[in-house]
UniProtKB/Swiss-Prot annotation:
Region (Disordered): 1-22
Organism, scientific name: Bacillus subtilis (strain 168)
Name this protein carries in UniProt: Spore protein YabP
Major place of residence: membrane
Record has Membrane as a keyword: yes
Gene designation: yabP
Amino acid sequence: MNSYYDQKGSSSVPEQHDVTMKGRKHLDISGVKHVESFDNEEFLLETVMGMLSVRGQNLQMKNLDVEKGIVSIKGRVFDLVYLDEQQGDKAKGFFSKLFK
């Protein structure tokens, strides 16, 4: 089983992870540990279940609650993709280099 399902971390972010989309225009995501990067076309989020890429058009962060691990995104959503551990490391490396 994936290590994300087995880990019980001591962080303040709840271990539960939910994604709620309303009409492809509004996303509420819980279980977010860290916002790796974001712009108007893509958000890269580290969640308790792994790296999550949200791609779309005119994306905006409407709410960020660090203590509860909740992110709200507004805009036209094209896709949501969970990256496996190897892809997540590659994506993090790419974005880390890009935004240094």
